[in-house]
Structures are given as structure tokens and as C-alpha cells.
């Protein structure tokens, strides 16, 4: 009975060690900010601009900005057009960038990673230069004519050094 208990303790220690190792490996020293905002199940309303408050610790640095889209099978289009802008301590709202994200190919096959009806795609916006540390507000809105846009599950942004 003692050897069985000892083995369980060993398994538990091994599981804890693997968990800690995976957390350490998963941490990316280059990622400054990475989060998603959920979209209601009924759809994304035209007037609902997504806001992301990003604390940027380093100034005089170029950052890579990416947008991540999680869509469901019921998204009715091949593409999603987004307007992305940001403002911060040293700037008043820069002109918006427009992203035309291709979510499905011409045959209707979803291009993102995923399964079970949920797919995630990542799109690079490019590099932005931050000249002053502080809090920056990133705004994301869709530019399609629909008043309610179904089939989008989450929108995320990622800022990397």
C-alpha cells in the first residue's frame, strides 16, 4: 500500500512540474499585450466599437501589431473588413488603418486554425513606433454594411516588441 501511495505522490509531483514548465514556456518575453474581447452570440452590433487599453512600458521602440479573429461556421462572408486606430500619451488619434481579413477561400473553406465550428486567424497590421510609454487606446470596428454581424466569436489584439 505504501508503494502505491508513493507512486501517487510521484505522479502528482510530475504533473505539477509539467504544469509549471508549460506555464514558463508559454510566457513570451516579446509579447507586451495579448487579449481578446468576446462578441455577443447574437452578433456584433455596428455601434459596438471594441476598446483595448494597452499599457506600453517602453518608449522609442517599434512594436508589431496583430489582430486575431475567431469566427464560427455561421459567419456569412469570405472576408471581414476592420478599421483599427489608436491614440496615446503623445498623440491624438492617428488615422485608422483598414484590414481586409480573408477568413475563407473561394471554395468556402475556413483558413484559420480550429475545429468544431470555431476558427482563429491572425493578421499582421505592421509595425508602429511608440515614442512615449503609457496607456494607449486601440479601437477596432467592422466596416461592413450589416447592422448586426453574425458569426464572429472574439476579436483580439497582440502587441509584441
Regions found by a protein language model. Name each.
Residues 2-15:
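Bacterial N-terminal signal peptides that target proteins for export
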Residues 23-26:
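C-terminal motif of bacterial Sec signal peptides marking the signal peptidase cleavage site
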Residues 28-31:
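Bacterial signal peptide processing site
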Residues 48-77:
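Post-signal-peptide N-terminal segment of Sec-exported extracytoplasmic proteins
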Residues 60-63, 124, 131-142:
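Short tyrosine-centred short linear motifs in exposed loops/low-complexity segments
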Residues 68-71, 139-146:
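Short beta-strand-plus-loop segments that form exposed binding edges in beta-rich domains
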Residues 76-82, 151-153:
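Short coil-to-beta strand junction motifs in C2/discoidin
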Residues 99-129:
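An anionic, turn-rich surface loop/hairpin at beta-sheet edges
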